A protein has these predicted regions:
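Short acidic, glycine/proline-rich loop/turn micro-motifs
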Residues: 1, 154-159, 213-215
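Rossmann-like dinucleotide-binding cores of NAD(P)H-dependent redox enzymes
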Residues: 141-180, 252-299
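Hydrophobic, well-ordered secondary-structure elements that form the walls
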Residues: 17, 40, 52, 177, ...
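Local beta-strand N-terminus motif with an aromatic residue
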Residues: 46, 177, 197-198, 322-323
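Short loop/edge segments at beta-strand edges and connector loops
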Residues: 170, 185-189, 223-225, 297-299, ...
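Rossmann-like dinucleotide/flavin-binding elements
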Residues: 113-145, 150, 185-192, 196, ...
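Flavin-dependent oxidoreductase catalytic cores
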Residues: 1-122, 126, 134-137, 142, ...
Length: 329
């Protein structure tokens, strides 16, 4: 099951079966954390815990749990990108978002550097954190520059409660950097900062694209990522999300859950969530239906006007009422 489904969703079944049989019963289904697994066993709901994806994310899951170091477990975030989608649905060899060495354990094994040096990493998002940690494990003296806060856009990605699993990934990556002695500098790196290092890794991330149409600079038009945080913008009423990729879809779902908003997705491609995982498609399509989110595909935005978003839909110009517009292009 994907991260949008509660963890341990099959435990009730294991508990019910255990009451009726005299043989050992296994509980399974999104049991990703040691404390949760222990809680199930201690409560008598099951005799054993069965897991699959967590062992792909970290094959030493059980060892680290047994030794009392759950903070060192690379967590399964139930994204299903590399395992279920790639393995089951596409028929390719599996990989893992949280474990880049999966399937390449020999080729990507971490060995001490032949010549340890001073390494700078620019950017404290997931790529920068992983690069800094890997360099530190190889024996380099690592300094990580981050102008905002460690985790980068993982903060926005994990803001919706239905994506809380990503918070585990962020906590793990930050913990490993701290444990392995990476020096963190909270500032934007400039050339003078980097000249003294033997090597520089650029992991500065990307900047969301805008919308090159008239009215895109209106006060009620903002980037979708500006809403996905604690102090983010919280408009109500008619909300239009321009862009039906994963970020746009998640933004629309989030606002449909927060209040009695009327939310609309406008996507220029023939379908929303193009290129996203099958699991995300299934879950979000269901949430879109349940929360009555309107979706326009093959729709080209022409302008953002005072009354709403003007778009070309089916060869005709149409005005979609909007009190606020979020860009997820």
């Amino acid at each position: 099951t994907p991260m949008q489904i509660p963890r341990g969703h099959n435990v009730w079944a294991a508990e019910a079966i255990k009451k009726e049989v005299s043989i050992p019963v296994f509980a399974t289904g999104s049991i990703t954390q040691p404390d949760f697994a222990e809680e199930i066993l201690a409560s008598g709901k099951a005799d054993f815990i069965s897991m699959g994806r967590p062992l792909l994310a970290d094959p030493y899951w059980a060892k680290k749990a047994m030794e009392g170091h759950p903070e060192d477990i690379s967590p399964c975030i139930r994204c299903n990108e590399g395992c279920l989608d790639r393995g089951n649905h596409i028929g390719k060899s599996i990989n893992c978002t949280m474990n880049p060495t999966l399937g390449f354990e020999d080729a990507l094994a971490i060995h001490p550097a032949e010549k340890p040096g001073k390494i700078a990493v620019v950017g404290g998002g997931p790529a920068g954190l992983k690069a800094a940690d890997t360099a530190a494990l190889r024996g380099h003296e690592v300094t990580l520059f981050e102008k905002r806060c460690l985790g980068g856009y993982l903060h926005e990605a994990s803001f919706p409660e239905f994506k809380a699993d990503i918070r585990d990934a962020m906590k793990y990556l930050i913990t490993q950097v701290e444990k392995h002695g990476v020096k963190v500098v909270k500032k934007e790196a400039v050339l003078e900062d980097l000249e003294k290092f033997d090597g520089v890794i650029i992991a500065a991330g990307s900047v969301p694209a805008g919308l090159p149409v008239p009215g895109a600079d209106r006060e009620n038009v903002t980037l979708a990522v500006d809403a996905l945080k604690e102090d983010g913008i919280r408009p109500t009423g008619n909300i239009v999300v321009v862009g039906g990729g994963l970020i746009g879809t998640e933004t629309a779902v989030q606002f449909s859950l927060e209040s009695a908003n009327h939310v609309t997705i406008v996507e220029m491609l023939p379908e929303i969530m193009r290129g996203c995982s099958d699991c995300d498609h299934i879950v979000y399509q269901d949430m879109i239906r349940k929360n009555h989110i309107a979706v326009y595909t093959s729709a080209r935005v022409l302008a953002v006007e005072e009354e709403g978003v003007a778009a070309e839909i089916g060869g005709c110009r149409r005005l979609i009422p909007a009190d606020h517009v979020f860009l997820a292009t």
